[in-house]
């Protein structure tokens, strides 16, 4: 059985919040950045009206078309595939955004088969060996696998030590963590 890796899409493969901040600032004369978001809950970080405007931008095609990949995410995903791992993209996106997301993934990650793109709200239902996400709630709920959080301002101050979640700051660290998990799991299986 091949080693299965679940990669979250938004803010792990793409720079969604960076793109949304840019459009929000242009349209509202504001100056917010990713650092504004010290919680995954947008409504805790912005006044209600601004939070409503911000979240509405997630449903605009022009925002999805402006997304760029997270630095080294293409290299990292390809390296995992080249190392023989099964890589799946997992996303809790709104259904109306899904076609734009799939199109974006096909443009920037053409080496990932479309059948490996999974739209799912409850990621704890996934049977994978490693899950990589920026939302700690997705990781804390899935105790059956190795877990990696890509550090972002909204998860930086969370207390996740008790959950055995590996914290990484970039894709080089993510690839190294997956390779280490694989090595450890192989050793366990051989004993």
Predicted features along the sequence, with ranges:
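Acidic, Mg2+-coordinating phosphoryl-transfer loop and its flanking beta/alpha structural elements
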Residues: 132-169
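Structural recognition of alpha->loop->beta junctions
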Residues: 104-120, 162-179
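A short acidic, often aromatic-flanked loop/helix-cap motif at beta-alpha or helix-coil junctions
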Residues: 40, 121-128, 155-157, 171-176
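Active-site neighborhood of HAD-like aspartate-dependent phosphohydrolases
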Residues: 1-53
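Metal-dependent phosphoesterase signature
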Residues: 32, 39-78
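Substrate-recognition element of Asp-dependent hydrolases with the DxDx(T/V) motif
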Residues: 64-68, 73-105
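Substrate-recognition "cap/lid" segment bordering the active-site pocket of phosphatases
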Residues: 90-141
């Amino acid at each position: 059985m091949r080693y299965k890796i679940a990669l979250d899409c938004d803010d792990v493969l793409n720079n969604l919040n960076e793109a949304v901040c840019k459009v929000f600032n242009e349209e509202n004369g504001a100056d917010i950045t990713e650092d504004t978001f010290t919680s995954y809950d947008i409504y805790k970080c912005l006044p209600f009206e601004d939070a409503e405007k911000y979240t509405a931008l997630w449903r605009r095609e022009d925002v999805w078309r402006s997304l760029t990949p997270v630095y080294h995410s293409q290299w990292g995903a390809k390296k995992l595939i080249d190392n023989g791992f099964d890589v799946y993209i997992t996303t809790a996106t709104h259904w109306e955004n899904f076609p734009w997301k799939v199109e974006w993934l096909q443009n920037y990650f053409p080496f990932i088969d479309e059948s490996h793109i999974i739209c799912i709200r409850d990621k704890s239902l996934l049977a994978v060996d490693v899950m990589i996400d920026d939302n700690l709630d997705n990781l804390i709920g899935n105790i059956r696998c190795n877990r990696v959080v890509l550090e972002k301002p909204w998860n930086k101050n969370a207390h996740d030590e008790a959950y055995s979640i590996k914290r990484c700051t970039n894709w080089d660290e993510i690839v190294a963590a997956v390779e280490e998990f694989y090595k450890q799991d192989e050793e366990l299986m051989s004993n």
